[in-house]
Structures are given as C-alpha cells and as structure tokens.
Curated annotation (Swiss-Prot):
NCBIfam families found in the cross-reference section: PRK05339.1 (NF003742)
UniProtKB keywords: Kinase, Nucleotide-binding, Serine/threonine-protein kinase, Transferase
Binding site for ADP: 151-158
Protein name: Putative pyruvate, phosphate dikinase regulatory protein 2
C-alpha cells in the first residue's frame, strides 16, 4: 500500500490540525497504513494556498487545514472544489456553530490559542518548582514556596503538590521522618504558608499495607508496623506544634478536597 500523503495547512503553526490528524491515524494499524505529513504553516496569501493546492494535486494528498481568516478560508474552499481534492476543515464547522450559539462573530485571528500570557508562564513555573523541590530535595526552596506541605509518608504530599502547582501555586513538600531532622529553615519561614497533613493511624496502616502488597512485599514490614506508625505520627505532631502551622486531616479526603482546603487556608491567612 502506498503512503498516504497528508498536507497540514494552517495560518498558524498547524499544531491543531496535526494533532487531530495524528489522533485519527492512531486508530489504524501502523504497519499496514503508512503515511507522510507535508506541513505548510503560516499561510498568509493566496499564493501560499496555490502552492498547497499544487502539491495536493501532484502527490494525491489529503488537505487537513485550519484557517480562521475568512478570505483565506473561502479561497481554500474554492480551490479545493475546483480541483476536486480530498480535504477536511478542522475548525470551520465548529466555529460556525459557536458563532450561531454565541450570537457573536469570532476574532478570526490566527494562533490565539498559542498566545502565552503571564498566567500560563506562572503555572509552568509552579509545576517545575513542584518537581524540583519534591520530597524536601533542597531546603533552599522553602523561602521561595507559596505553600509548604509537611506530613509522614503516604499522605499524598507529591500528588497534592502537583495538583496545586496546576493552579499556579509554588509548592514544596517536606517528609517528616523520625530519623531525619527537618531543615532548620522549616522553622524559620512564615508558618502561615505551612500546612501539615494529618492522617489517622488506622488509615495510614491500611495505605501502607496496600503499598507493600503492590511492591510484592509482606505487610509485616516495619513500614506498616503499628508501633512504627504511632512513632511517626507522634514525631509529626511534635514538629507541627513546634512550627505552629495549620493542620488538615487527609484521612478520608480526595486530593481535590484537600487542595481546596489548602487554598482556603492560604488565601484566608493572606488577607
């Protein structure tokens, strides 16, 4: 079977059209269904479209396009019809429906989805921060963090940090373990940005036993031992008292619930 040629034509970078095309292609056997992408980004003139049409004719290609400027879209449709080419307009039909539903004309500006604003960059910075300072890797992150989470192992510190990072908060988490003295800086930072994650002994015991099973280990390991858990929680409570920070009981809460509680505490304390 010959390679299917797919032209990606766009008045922006063409990412949207290519993602849709690749999603469709993924539904077919890659060994049997060979394909080739031909990219034509930043189409600005009718001459650019003429080139796309010429290549589509010469190579018997399918045109997958995203054009938001009405004059360019109309010209593309006209040339496709005249040349009887195979094509798909990725955005046009939905844009038409939305125009009617909103009773408002679209901006018709290429690349708007890629205009990265301050909020976007802030979120990316927060995500990178959460990865860099996960699990107390570097105490230098403590004064830079918007939120500092502390808790014993298996209190969802890492996933909670990532969830909050996607809401643009710079979060560092610090594990509390009896054998490891917390960094001095933890007691020097503003306690209002520190949140302690408390969990019941019973819940922690169940979670840790389940974790050991997943790892193919017996549940009698010290990690899930009741005496050990009591020791860890006692040490955790001592650290919390020393810091004087807010506490959230995560025993029966989903990540989303805990995140909302954290945000509410942080925002109320910043007022």
């Amino acid at each position: 079977m010959e390679n299917i040629k797919i032209i990606i034509a766009s008045d922006s970078i063409g990412e949207t059209a290519e993602l849709v095309a690749r999603a469709c292609i993924s539904q077919f056997n890659p060994k049997e269904c060979k394909h080739e992408f031909l990219r034509y980004p930043y189409i600005e003139t009718k001459e650019d479209i003429d080139e796309v049409i010429q290549v589509a004719n010469d190579r018997n290609a399918i045109i997958v396009y995203t054009l938001v400027k009405p004059e360019m879209k109309t010209y593309m449709e006209s040339k496709i019809g005249t040349n009887k080419l195979r094509s798909i307009d990725i955005m046009g039909p939905l844009m038409g429906y939305l125009k009617d539903a909103f009773e408002e004309n679209p901006y018709n500006q290429p690349g708007r989805v890629h205009r990265l604003d301050d909020a976007y960059f802030k979120k990316i910075d927060a995500i990178e921060f959460a990865v860099k300072y996960d699990d107390g890797k570097d105490p230098k992150g403590l004064p830079k963090a918007d939120i500092v989470l502390i808790g014993v192992s298996r209190t969802s510190k890492t996933p909670l940090s990532q969830y909050l990072a996607h809401k643009s908060y710079k979060v560092m988490n610090v594990p509390i373990v009896p054998e490891v003295t917390p960094p001095d800086m933890l007691f020097d930072i503003d306690s209002s940005k520190c949140i302690a994650l408390r969990i019941s002994e019973e819940k922690l015991n169940r979670i840790r036993k389940q974790r050991l099973k997943q790892l193919g280990l017996g549940d009698s390991a010290r990690y899930a031992n009741e005496i050990r858990i009591k020791e860890e929680i006692k040490y955790f409570e001592d650290i919390v008292d020393r810091i004087g920070c807010a506490v959230i009981d995560v025993s029966d809460k989903a990540i989303e619930e805990t995140a909302n509680d954290v945000i509410n505490i942080i925002e109320s304390q910043s007022k």
